[in-house]
Amino acid sequence: MSKKLIGLAGKAGAGKDTVADYLWEKEGAIKIAFADALRAAGASIFGLDPRNFLDRDLKEAEVEYWGMTPRRMLQLLGTEATKSVFGDDIWLKRWFLSYSAVQDTDHVVVPDVRFDVEAEAIRHLGGTIIHIVRPGVGLDGDSATHVSEAGIEFRFGDMHLSNSGSVEELHHKVDRLWETIK
C-alpha cells in the first residue's frame, strides 16, 4: 500500500472535517491541519480554550471581551498579523515540520487547504487535492469576505466531491474516491 497525502478544500460547512475524520476512522489517516499551530497560538494569545477554535458553534459565537468570533480571531492572526512579517508561507512551513515528523504513517489528510500555495505544496509532495462542494454552505459577515475564504484554483489532477446527501452517502463517495487515488 502506498502512502497517500490528501488535501481537502471547500467552504466552511462543506464537510472537510467530516471527510478527514472518516479517513482517520476507516484508513488510519493522520489529520494534520495547516491551522493546528495557529489554533494553539490563538488559544494562548486570546486566553481561550482550544475548543473555541474547533467546535463549529463555538468558533462562530462572538467572544464579548474581544468583540469578534474565534474564527475571525484566527483569520486576522493567521494572515494580517503574521504573513506580512514572516511571509505568506509561514503556516505552510510550520505544517511541514509536523508533516515531516509523522512520515512513518501510511496516510496523511489535511482538512483545511485555503490558499493556492498550500495546495501547490501538497501537489509537489505527490498529494491529491479534493475540492468538496456542498450547496448552501459558507460564512456570513466579515468572516465570509476574508481572503482565507476565497477558495483555491482547481488544477489538473484535483478531484471533485459533491456533498449533497447524507453522511453515509458522503462516506460512500469518499470510499470510491479513495480507491482511485494513487
Q: Can you describe what each PLM-predicted range is?
A:
Residues K31, V108, I129, H160-L161:
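Short, well-ordered beta-strand core segments
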Residues S2-I6:
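Extreme N-terminal starter segment of soluble prokaryotic enzymes
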Residues D36-D106:
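ATP-dependent small-molecule kinase phosphotransfer cores
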Residues V19:
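Hydrophobic positions on the alpha1 helix immediately C-terminal to the Walker A/P-loop
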Residues L8, V110:
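Hydrophobic anchor at the beta1->P-loop junction of P-loop NTPases
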